[in-house]
């Protein structure tokens, strides 16, 4: 059997021999000094089934080893990473990118048509400079607002973590902390993200990650202009230490005349005031959730009028200089709302036990006229008899909780200590 590349028995002339892979920053890892192994014609591409050069490396400490999954020709056709198959420009799945650019790339899937299509694309790639994608993607020049909102601007290195240890899930892992796999609870098997296919990811069909991102894009918030037509100022937050006034002016000058740009380095924000309301509305629409400078996504909102900020300061109890006022001592706090009529009638404010009917107090009535008893010596006539002790069959008053409730507290036992 011939094994030379010149033999067309197995179409070896189309086998790939590369010196460096096409990778995204996330798959490459955060360590700039990595050791990468190269295996010439090590595996076949999972899309076109042709042998290609396989690269294998470890992206960082406590990360799993990664390798290239598709050949560079298939990677250039879709402008994706050879490992994760996400778009190199936006970091999104192919299905989301194609939906944002409003085009559908129908690649052949049968063996013969796929090989013929790949050879034609390789010829087109060889005639280009290799910096731009070919095919339908190379003809799409317009950008999408949805892609700018969903784009991942920073690497997500947690994607390189090891897989979950199956022995730990069964309770049989004996490696402990030395186990190279994760000791975590696996995801729900019914979760759509648990079942992913590399071919579905490449062709942009039935991708659960793409479906999740498209649903998020449909429910993404909007920035509505304020009702006050005099507001022409935009707030830009999250500047950091690297973004300057020149960077902001280079972005916002295209929307209209800029009156002033005020950068507050202490709060890491800026205020851009336009000359007209129309320019401010266009800038807010084109920059909301899409303003990225030096790989940093900035937060764009509408500014507030001086009257609205003054009312808010009065409500918060702050002065114009931002000093918080202390509450005046001696003033009562907020009182609870009064109870309803039914609740107030049945409320027990002193936690007293329920008692029966009120005790009857023996009050002597005045005698009929003409039959008044003689007054005691030394006293004038009186109208009421002195109160006597209650009869034994009558109920005593309720329980006593405080000394002031005792009816015999003031000199009731004086007769016991007096001399006979």
UniProtKB/Swiss-Prot annotation:
Modified residue annotations for Phosphoserine: 4, 102
SMART domains the UniProt entry points to: RRM, ZnF_C3H1
Cellular component GO terms, alphabetical: cytoplasm; nucleus; Prp19 complex; U2-type catalytic step 1 spliceosome; U2-type catalytic step 2 spliceosome
Chief localisation class: nucleus
Compartment(s): Nucleus; Cytoplasm
Comp. bias intervals (Basic and acidic residues): 309-318
Organism listed in the record: Bos taurus (Bovine)
Gene Ontology terms describing biological process: cellular response to xenobiotic stimulus; mRNA cis splicing, via spliceosome; positive regulation of protein export from nucleus; positive regulation of protein import into nucleus; positive regulation of RNA splicing
An annotated Gene Ontology molecular function: zinc ion binding
Domain (RRM): residue spans on this chain: 232-305
Modified residues (N6-acetyllysine): 212
Descriptive protein name: Pre-mRNA-splicing factor RBM22
Subunit structure: Component of the pre-catalytic and catalytic spliceosome complexes. Component of the postcatalytic spliceosome P complex. Interacts with PDCD6; the interaction induces translocation of PDCD6 in the cytoplasm. Interacts with PPIL1.
Domain of life: Eukaryota
Region (Disordered): 303-343, 372-420
Domain notes: The C-terminal RRM domain and the zinc finger motif are necessary for RNA-binding.
Job of this protein: Required for pre-mRNA splicing as component of the activated spliceosome. Involved in the first step of pre-mRNA splicing. Binds directly to the internal stem-loop (ISL) domain of the U6 snRNA and to the pre-mRNA intron near the 5' splice site during the activation and catalytic phases of the spliceosome cycle. Involved in both translocations of the nuclear SLU7 to the cytoplasm and the cytosolic calcium-binding protein PDCD6 to the nucleus upon cellular stress responses.
The UniProt record lists the keyword Secreted: no
Family: Belongs to the SLT11 family.
Keywords, in A-Z order: Acetylation, Cytoplasm, Isopeptide bond, Metal-binding, mRNA processing, mRNA splicing, Nucleus, Phosphoprotein, RNA-binding, Spliceosome, Transport, Ubl conjugation, Zinc, Zinc-finger
UniProt zinc finger (C3H1-type) residues: 159-186
Record location of the Glycyl lysine isopeptide (Lys-Gly) (interchain with G-Cter in SUMO2) cross-link: 139, 149, 290
Positions of post-translational N-acetylalanine modification: 2
């Amino acid at each position: 059997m011939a094994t030379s590349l010149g033999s067309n028995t197995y179409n070896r002339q189309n086998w790939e021999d590369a010196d460096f892979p096409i990778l995204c920053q996330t798959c490459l890892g955060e360590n700039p000094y990595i050791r990468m192994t190269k295996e010439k014609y090590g595996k076949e591409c999972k899309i076109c089934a042709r042998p290609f050069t396989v690269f294998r490396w470890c992206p960082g400490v406590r990360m799993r080893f990664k390798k290239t999954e598709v050949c560079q020709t298939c990677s250039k056709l879709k402008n994706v990473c050879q490992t994760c198959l996400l778009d190199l420009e936006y970091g999104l799945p192919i299905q989301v990118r194609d939906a944002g650019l409003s085009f559908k790339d129908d690649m052949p899937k049968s063996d013969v048509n796929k090989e013929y299509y790949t050879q034609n694309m390789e010829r087109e790639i060889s005639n280009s400079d290799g910096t731009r994608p070919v095919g339908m993607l190379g003809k799409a020049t317009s950008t999408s607002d949805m892609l700018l909102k969903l784009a991942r601007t920073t690497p997500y290195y947690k994607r390189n973590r090891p897989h979950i240890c199956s022995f730990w899930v069964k309770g049989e892992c004996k490696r402990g902390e030395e186990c190279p796999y994760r000791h975590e609870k696996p995801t729900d098997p019914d979760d759509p993200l648990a079942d992913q296919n590399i071919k579905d990811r490449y062709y942009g069909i039935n991708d659960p990650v793409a479906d999740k991102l498209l649903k998020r894009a449909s429910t993404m918030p909007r920035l509505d202009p304020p009702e006050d037509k005099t507001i022409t100022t935009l707030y830009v937050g999250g500047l950091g230490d690297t973004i300057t006034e020149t960077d902001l002016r280079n972005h916002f000058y295209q929307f209209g005349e800029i009156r002033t740009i005020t950068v507050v380095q202490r709060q890491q924000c800026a205020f851009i005031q336009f000359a007209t309301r129309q320019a401010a509305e266009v800038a807010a629409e084109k920059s909301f959730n899409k303003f990225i400078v030096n790989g940093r996504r900035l937060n764009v909102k509408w500014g507030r009028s001086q009257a609205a900020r003054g009312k808010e300061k009065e409500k918060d109890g702050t002065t114009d200089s931002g000093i918080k006022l202390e509450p005046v001592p001696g003033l009562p706090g907020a009182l609870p709302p009064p109870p309803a009529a039914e609740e107030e009638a049945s409320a027990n404010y002193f936690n007293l036990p329920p008692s029966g009917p009120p005790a009857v107090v023996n009050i002597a009535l005045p005698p009929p006229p003409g039959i008044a008893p003689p007054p005691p010596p030394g006293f004038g006539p009186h109208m009421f008899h002195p109160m006597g002790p209650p009869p034994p069959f009558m109920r005593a008053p309720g329980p006593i909780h405080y000394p002031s409730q005792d009816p015999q507290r003031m000199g009731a036992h004086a007769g016991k200590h007096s001399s006979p």
